[in-house]
Amino acid sequence: MNIHSVMPLNAVARKTRASSADAPPGPKRDAILRAAIDTFAERGYFNAQVADVARAAGVAAGTVYLYFKSKDDLLVSIFERSMREGLTDSRAAVADLADPPERLRRLARGHLARLGNDRNLAVVFQVELRQSTKFMERFSSTLLRDYLGLMREAIADGQREGLFRADIKPTSAAKMLFGALDEMATNWILSRRRYSLEAVADEVVDFFLNGARAR
């Protein structure tokens, strides 16, 4: 399953209720979010209850509702916080790089490293998020668009420098590259074999660059 089959860039985010992603951070809120990631990954989002999350976080069930409106709000908050952290890390990773191919390589490595270093987060992102209709109604497409924008900018810069084919649409190419990384992350979760997810990044980028390079 590709993320763009369930999270189109031009999706209109129908936020019927405000997310708690922008609530003041704190150790207890962070602990609840971490517990939610682990609980949703281990039990499955639909099978998990807020009480399960509270138990894993070591707090009363009522305490969860001081920070999050519902189980759905927890799921949206996981996505938004993780995407914001990913954006910050990705921007920092390419801030000192001018070379477009190397920027794509660093972005790919960083994306797979984040998921590869936190298997439960990867399960939530690759599996659980995509099964929630309410999440699909509420998630912010802006974060995903900004995240893919880093790849799109590198591709557009490569075209201006004559490194990449001019007939490629940067937005479409960014989706293709991200889609390949997304699929590798899903395969990593489903595989019985244990291996470094980050190590796959270079293979994906090399394959992409071979098709994108100017002839």
Where are each of the predicted segments found?
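N-terminal intrinsically disordered/low-complexity leader segments
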Residues: M1-P27, R34, D38, R215
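Hydrophobic alpha-helical segments that form the core
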Residues: H4-V6, I168-N187, A199-L209
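Helix-turn-helix
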Residues: A31, T39-D73, S77
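Amphipathic C-terminal alpha-helical segment
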Residues: A113-N117, E153, D157, L177-Y195, ...
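Amphipathic alpha-helical segments used for helix-helix packing
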Residues: L115-F135, N187
